[in-house]
Amino acid sequence: RIVLWTLFALVLLVAPKVFTSSLSMTMLTQMGIAIIACLSYNMLLGQGGMLSFGHAVYSGLGSFAAIHVLNKVADGAWSVPVSLLPLVGGLAGLLVAALLGALTTKKSGTIFAMITLGIGELVFSMSLMLPEFFGGEGGIASNRVVGEPFLGITFGPETEVYYLIAVYTFVCTVLMFAFTHTPLGRMLNAVRDNPERVEFIGYDTQRVRFFAFMIAGFFIGIAGGLYTINFEIVTAEVVGAHRSGAYLLFTFLGGALFFFGPIIGAVMMVLATVLLSEMTKAWLLYLGIFFLVMVMYAPGGVSGLIMMNLRLAAYGMLRRLWTSYLALAGTLLVVLTAVGVIVEMIYHIKLNEAMGPEMTFMGATINTQGADAWVGATFLLITGVGLFELVRRQFVHQWSQIQEDIEAENLRRQMH
């Protein structure tokens, strides 16, 4: 464990030295913020079984609290170090979570999810009704370079902002991991798995959910404060359903069953919203397709896939699947290429018709009005799907056989 934490700290420390471009620094800072946010969300979803559709409320209000304090500092009314603004956001998130959590955590399951959805929509609608606090449609802007520099650090350069975010990311990640091993964290798992039994032995499940809800609100409020420092502007979008949906979607894609899953999901979120959105206008469609595939074939997320294969590697049986993995990757690449060609041709016809019938896809020029392009892409898609299904069935058979061999090996070890 110490090795893993040391490696994590080294990655945070060395990352800006390896990825030196302006785009890379932008993505790294956003990844740090997203890691805290997704880990906080997973305290509810993965550890507590609470499906929230309004978690952005607490990060967003944390952002607004931080930017109001930052403007007070800029006006000379208050004296708060910029490096402590994330804690201001955290306290704001904690306070709001305490107020709203007293209501939302009275119920669990579907009712809890619907209550959080309603609260999220309520706060977003209030953002348009209270321009004094939320800044109206334009939001509230500020300047993070205020106050006296501390040891020459002004937080003007993006590198200084990154390392501030990196410190908070590391500390918050350690604290949230430590929470999973506390009595409250263990009891939260019990409430998720069997709330009736927890009630039977004398614990108040609503109180357990409430405390976890407040802690999650504190950490995502810190993420909101870091958002303020990084972007220097906060709009009503930060409390919207789109942001809450992103936390849910990418936490699930990363894997809610393992602690490091939301970290993977956070990295994927930034890659999708920053890189993929610049590469294609159909990025949301691709994201939706990827989500459907993961739900159907890997509901445990990326981290679930990693842990399953690590288990096979521990028994020395992973090498039996290399051929199948290569076949799956090859056929999946064919399917993705065909889907990409068809989707991009449709988008080109609908959105870029004035630019002519030709488009470029992966370095190749394609005529969107030519029948050969459509026939070829359709044939490639049908062939790829058919081959993928054949390979998948063979893979499932191999996987089942390996699981039986592992069970037999476990029985043999127990007998000896």
Region roles according to the model:
Residues 1-416:
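Transmembrane alpha-helices and adjacent helix-loop boundaries
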